[in-house]
């Protein structure tokens, strides 16, 4: 099996090399022609195709050429070719940071102010993105991102009334039971054999961050750094923290009785189409859902319910879930803290408020980068400056009716008055800094494609029809520990 995989990989690389030999490389290329390679994911690329056309029409010095693929791995494999690589600029996800040191710095793009605008590109970015992309060693930017997509729990508005939306995970559990009692299937999501668990990792990571707090999540868990500053710390990776608490929530709400039979399907298109036809009330997905399926289904995304076990981390550890929910309601209503309004301390209020704003934003993983050996680097930067100007951002927003990763310098250019409820919700969520993957995370995670759950199956473990195959949260956690035990030496000995 390993031999055949190697041969397949070698053949793929040979094919890419053949394509490169037919085109340009960094030694003989036209420095004024920008070869762009872009990943076509759920957002499509109509917006980028239009921006490329507009850029080419706007000036005569440079020419941008766009090539696309629905397979991010195919795109990234071109980086194996080094200076024989034909591409100058990428819009894609990255499985690992194997090639990161060969990416050019893009700080001068961020410091640029487009003509007629009052802010630099850097000043236009929504909160969190630049923090996630800043190099932890030298503070420079070798990665930027495109888009502004969040992932969370989606609900069918015809099956779940807005007044019944859960503010806590205990309330989410009650909602799942109530739906079942009404003969409505609560959950339908797809089975991804990779590390995302049918997008559930986005929600479970949010719950983990809610429980432990963002400081712990970013500065200890994701950096694998202990309280003494030692990193990588295996003890931190194995600590039974908010990740375990998230698994306990999932164990409660995901069962054979609460899930659609198609939850075992690995075909996300089939599952999403069934969901959008009303086959279940809830799913886990992201901003791209309606665009990817060309649907106008009556759905919306809820704020991620606050994990009820957060009370274990509060000063008031005896706070009831009803009290927690009421505090969250007041926060949602925009009520400022005072002792008469809130039945909790200021510290607990701040902790709960932070948790309420946590929703996973995966656009920080949709990267823009340029190889530093490209002789069209100046041209690529000229394109990026154009890409982040208001007219290009407006193209993105008008095409998708979703927020971009940067705000318009002139907000009045976009008319969202006729946007759907779905779009308006997602524009609202963009105002809060999302939970994001950062370049400062531990090389154990960053360079080996390992996530906070060590890549183990979570959601699928709880819904197996055969009782002998079904696992509980403790068994999934034991599997996580086993994966860490098996991989730790390879991850840390480089």
Language model segments and positions:
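Short, well-ordered beta-strand elements
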Residues: 30-42, 62-67, 89, 142
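Short, polar/charged alpha-helical segment
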Residues: 41-61
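Glycine-centered hinge/linker elements that transmit conformational signals in sensory
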Residues: 176-179, 218-265, 294-295, 304-310, ...
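Extracytoplasmic/periplasmic substrate-recognition and gating elements
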Residues: 139, 295-403
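Extracytoplasmic "Venus flytrap"/periplasmic binding protein-like
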Residues: 54, 58-125, 158-167, 274
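Conserved C-terminal helix/tail region of periplasmic/extracytoplasmic solute-binding proteins
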Residues: 393-394, 406-494
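Extracytoplasmic/periplasmic solute-binding protein
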Residues: 135-146, 151, 173-234
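Hinge/lid segment of periplasmic solute-binding proteins
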Residues: 94-151, 173, 324-353
């Amino acid at each position: 099996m390993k031999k055949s995989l190697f041969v397949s990989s070698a053949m793929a690389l040979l094919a890419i090399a053949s394509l490169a030999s037919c085109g340009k490389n960094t030694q003989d290329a036209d420095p004024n022609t920008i070869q762009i390679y872009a990943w076509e994911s759920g957002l499509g690329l109509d917006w980028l195709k239009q921006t490329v056309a507009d850029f080419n029409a706007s000036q005569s010095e440079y020419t941008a050429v766009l090539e696309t693929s629905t397979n991010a791995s195919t795109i990234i494999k071109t980086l194996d070719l080094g200076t024989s690589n034909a591409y100058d600029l990428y819009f894609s996800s990255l499985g690992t940071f194997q090639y990161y040191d060969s990416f050019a710095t893009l700080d001068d793009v961020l410091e640029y102010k487009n003509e007629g605008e009052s802010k630099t590109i850097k000043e236009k970015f929504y909160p969190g993105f630049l923090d996630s992309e800043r190099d932890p060693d030298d503070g420079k930017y070798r990665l930027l991102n495109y888009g502004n997509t969040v992932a969370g729990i989606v609900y069918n508005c015809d099956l779940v009334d807005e007044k019944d939306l859960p503010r806590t995970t205990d309330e989410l559990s009650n909602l799942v039971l109530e739906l079942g009692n009404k003969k409505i299937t609560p959950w339908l999501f797809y089975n991804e054999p990779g590390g995302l668990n049918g997008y559930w990792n986005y929600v479970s990571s949010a719950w983990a961050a809610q429980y432990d707090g963002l400081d712990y999540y970013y500065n200890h868990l994701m950096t694998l750094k202990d309280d003494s500053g030692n990193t990588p710390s295996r003890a931190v990776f194995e600590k039974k923290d908010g990740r375990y608490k998230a698994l306990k929530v999932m164990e409660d709400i995901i069962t054979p009785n609460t899930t659609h039979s198609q939850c075992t399907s690995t075909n996300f298109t089939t599952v999403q189409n069934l969901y959008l036809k009303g086959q279940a009330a809830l799913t886990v997905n992201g901003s791209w859902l309606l665009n990817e399926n060309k649907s106008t289904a009556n759905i919306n995304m809820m704020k991620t319910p606050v994990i009820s076990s957060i009370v274990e981390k509060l000063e008031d550890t005896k706070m009831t879930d009803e009290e927690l929910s009421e505090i969250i309601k007041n926060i949602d209503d925009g009520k400022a803290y005072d002792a008469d309004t809130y039945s909790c301390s200021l510290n607990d209020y701040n902790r709960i408020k932070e948790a309420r704003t946590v929703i996973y934003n995966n656009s920080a993983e949709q990267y823009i980068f340029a190889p530093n050996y490209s002789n069209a680097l100046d041209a690529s930067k000229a394109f990026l400056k154009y890409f982040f100007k208001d007219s290009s951002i407006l193209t993105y927003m008008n095409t998708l009716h979703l927020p971009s990763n940067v705000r318009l310098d002139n907000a009045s250019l976009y008319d969202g008055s006729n946007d759907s409820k779905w779009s308006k919700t997602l524009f609202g969520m963009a105002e809060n800094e999302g939970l994001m993957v950062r370049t400062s995370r531990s090389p154990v995670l960053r360079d080996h494609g390992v996530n906070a759950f060590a890549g183990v199956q979570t959601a699928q473990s709880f819904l197996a029809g055969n009782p002998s195959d079904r696992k509980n949260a403790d068994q999934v956690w034991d599997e996580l520990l086993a994966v860490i035990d098996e991989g730790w030496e390879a991850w840390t000995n480089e």
